[in-house]
């Protein structure tokens, strides 16, 4: 009995569980989960570079710095295209990759994609309602990071993910009513984005869809309350117009704004012909060939890896959250998610960006 009595004396006194203690543990858990997601993004940025495309970007940047900063009108690295116009819409990213290589070689390229991946992870995990636990937001961010992991390479796709994340961050703030300066933030973002990446039109596309949903919501509310639509809608249309017009701020304004046409009518069909998914070597060729095929293609679907599975799961989560919420205020996000899902069904290349939209919607 004395041993049991000594053991009881050594045990700490029981403390009552208070709401303050529960809140403190929740905050600590949210902090750890959030930074675990960011560390996962950084870790996934440390991957092998097995694509030769960055070498072309390096030489392109070197050539532009040696002959002026602006891109040439023709492809100087091709004998067959020497006399033909070859617009390099993403010319500014060539400079970024070339300078990264010039400063630190392959380590510079690795640091570039690690930094971009970390920024994307940081922004995704810090989009939440103030005062509300962020554990679910962090889980959605993890799914988005895994879905984007296949694009953590020193290519313009890095800019696509960062640009889409920034766009959704500002639209999320607008949804919460805490956004300011969107009339200049979004157009400036897209103007810079379109010189770094030919897929900047995705950002303008999401902006148009989101504000279209906001306009529909305002009209429904005004019709039910017999109230006049507020003139604030004019500022929304101004933001939309400037965001689309920002695609013209490029040395090649025509090809920049027509990038989606070129992408779906020229680039993707050419890549499909070059990298088939129906031959026996497709299963051992880890060259991202599924990106150029529809997700509804059975041959492409069987080649899906963890990134595509995570993206599909996140899209499903986004639609489930919108279904459970069922509020008109989310029409903007619903329009954006529906159209980005449609684009990803058309070509798997857009699945990471659709996953980013879904992560913000679901979180």
How should each PLM-predicted stretch be described?
Residues 41, 144-148, 183-198, 207, ...:
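Membrane-interface alpha helices of multi-pass inner-membrane proteins
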Residues 80-107, 111:
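Short hydrophobic/aromatic helix or loop-helix immediately within or flanking a transmembrane segment
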Residues 88-99, 258-309:
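Juxtamembrane membrane-water interface segments that cap and precede transmembrane helices
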Residues 111-131:
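Transmembrane-helix motifs of polytopic, lipid-linked glycan transferases
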Residues 129, 218-236, 303-310, 316-336:
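Membrane-interface helix-loop-helix junctions at transmembrane boundaries of multi-pass membrane enzymes
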Residues 152-159:
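Short acidic/glycine- and proline-prone juxtamembrane loop motifs at membrane-interface regions
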Residues 165-183, 320-325:
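Membrane-interface transmembrane helices that cradle and orient dolichyl/undecaprenyl
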Residues 173-191, 234-238, 334-338:
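Short hydrophobic alpha-helices at membrane interfaces in multi-pass membrane enzymes
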